[in-house]
Amino acid sequence: YLIFLSVVAALGGFLFGYDTAVISGTIAQVTQLFQLDTLQQGWYVGCALIGSIVGVLFAGILSDKLGRKMTMIISATLFSTSALGCAISADFTQLVVYRIIGGVGIGVVSIVSPLYISEVAVAQYRGRLVSLYQLAVTVGFLGAYLINYQLLAYAESGNQLSMDWLNKIFVTEVWRGMLGMETLPAVLFFIIIFF
């Protein structure tokens, strides 16, 4: 059960890694679609860090007042909102706002998940279990790169999907699918926190 709790909390690290790395596959299409200049490109890539700062500043306060699990639930909600919002953004401003929301999730989870693991772990295994969080961050990076690669390969294959909205997300504007795919692990994180 201790390992399960640690893996659940470490899933927050996966989301941190995914959210941080997924942006790399989206820059070219987002730049073209919204006709971004280099300053706007930088803002698009870096705006999540603003949210991260906010998340880090409030993570300790939230976790002390609401508890570690409730704060991780808030983080999962922020990640889900960000991923879904990015996938359906109508303009650049909306996209940036949702990226900042995801950044808040990054900031919160980067404090609370390792803290939670260290509190539930017995001293004998604490170091190993807390390291699961960092491993999950790295796996999140890899996951984002693999998802980006697969979605881009599918989009470039010329295959079309039968529903227009799916076609838009996974073929014509595949960056939406890349950002939106984070919804799946975020919802999983949200659900399994309750166990």
Identify the function of each model-found stretch.
Residues 1-195:
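Transmembrane-helix signature of 12-pass secondary carriers
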